[in-house]
Amino acid sequence: MAKLTKRMSVIRDKVDATKQYDITEAIALLKELATAKFVESVDVAVNLGIDARKSDQNVRGATVLPNGTGRSVRVAVFAQGANAEAAKAAGAELVGMEDLADQIKKGEMNFDVVIASPDAMRVVGQLGQVLGPRGLMPNPKVGTVTPNVAEAVKNAKAGQVRYRNDKNGIIHTTIGKVDFDTEKLKENLESLLVALKKAKPTQAKGVYIKKISLSTTMGAGVAVDQAGLTAVAN
């Protein structure tokens, strides 16, 4: 049996795996246990009452968190003409068409998000094997294929998170950094849950949001009592 590290031993002693914590208590616990030498992210896992094997029950989308994510996001945009200029004005780090595609083919991928205008997809389509596996392929369902590239750039910079359930029907994403105020983390979580409820497939039956867990980058999961969350109760 592997020996527990001192850090994991402390986490195991502090976190009751059988308990659902009030959201404020859960965040306080995460803050107490975040002892890494960097500012850890606060991540969330939401178990949804969907059948992930059925395509009409899959949940995918994007939402802008009211308090951002605490991350600096570099944006690449495929656009030309007025759209290209608008993307630059909105703060995109990389803007182009075939020239940008050539950079990516060479392995130059110094960006976190890729956005494309619809007319640029003829170029972006050639990059599916490169961008797809990295989760960077633009998609209209998450607002990264859009005629309004400037707005998409602003959203990405403002703290937009993309979400998509895994094969077990679980959404994994981030809601900020552990040094955020407790209220800001709570607001971000509530905002995400509102977006997930709006994205509920009509075919999904029974309890939709089944379980919510919070964790930090290096920490264990802490189950959250949904009774204290406005977005779930309403």
UniProtKB/Swiss-Prot annotation:
<comment type="function">
    <text>Protein L1 is also a translational repressor protein, it controls the translation of the L11 operon by binding to its mRNA.</text>
</comment>
<dbReference type="GO" id="GO:0006417">
    <property type="term" value="P:regulation of translation"/>
</dbReference>
<dbReference type="InterPro" id="IPR002143">
    <property type="entry name" value="Ribosomal_uL1"/>
</dbReference>
<dbReference type="GO" id="GO:0022625">
    <property type="term" value="C:cytosolic large ribosomal subunit"/>
</dbReference>
<dbReference type="GO" id="GO:0006412">
    <property type="term" value="P:translation"/>
</dbReference>
<protein>
    <recommendedName>
        <fullName>Large ribosomal subunit protein uL1</fullName>
    </recommendedName>
</protein>
<dbReference type="InterPro" id="IPR028364">
    <property type="entry name" value="Ribosomal_uL1/biogenesis"/>
</dbReference>
<dbReference type="Pfam" id="PF00687">
    <property type="entry name" value="Ribosomal_L1"/>
</dbReference>
<dbReference type="GO" id="GO:0000049">
    <property type="term" value="F:tRNA binding"/>
</dbReference>
<dbReference type="GO" id="GO:0003735">
    <property type="term" value="F:structural constituent of ribosome"/>
</dbReference>
<keyword id="KW-0694">RNA-binding</keyword>
<keyword id="KW-0699">rRNA-binding</keyword>
<dbReference type="GO" id="GO:0019843">
    <property type="term" value="F:rRNA binding"/>
</dbReference>
<dbReference type="InterPro" id="IPR023673">
    <property type="entry name" value="Ribosomal_uL1_CS"/>
</dbReference>
<keyword id="KW-0820">tRNA-binding</keyword>
<keyword id="KW-0687">Ribonucleoprotein</keyword>
<dbReference type="InterPro" id="IPR005878">
    <property type="entry name" value="Ribosom_uL1_bac-type"/>
</dbReference>
<keyword id="KW-0810">Translation regulation</keyword>
<comment type="subunit">
    <text>Part of the 50S ribosomal subunit.</text>
</comment>
<dbReference type="InterPro" id="IPR023674">
    <property type="entry name" value="Ribosomal_uL1-like"/>
</dbReference>
<keyword id="KW-0678">Repressor</keyword>
<dbReference type="InterPro" id="IPR016095">
    <property type="entry name" value="Ribosomal_uL1_3-a/b-sand"/>
</dbReference>
<keyword id="KW-0689">Ribosomal protein</keyword>
<comment type="similarity">
    <text>Belongs to the universal ribosomal protein uL1 family.</text>
</comment>
<comment type="function">
    <text>Binds directly to 23S rRNA. The L1 stalk is quite mobile in the ribosome, and is involved in E site tRNA release.</text>
</comment>
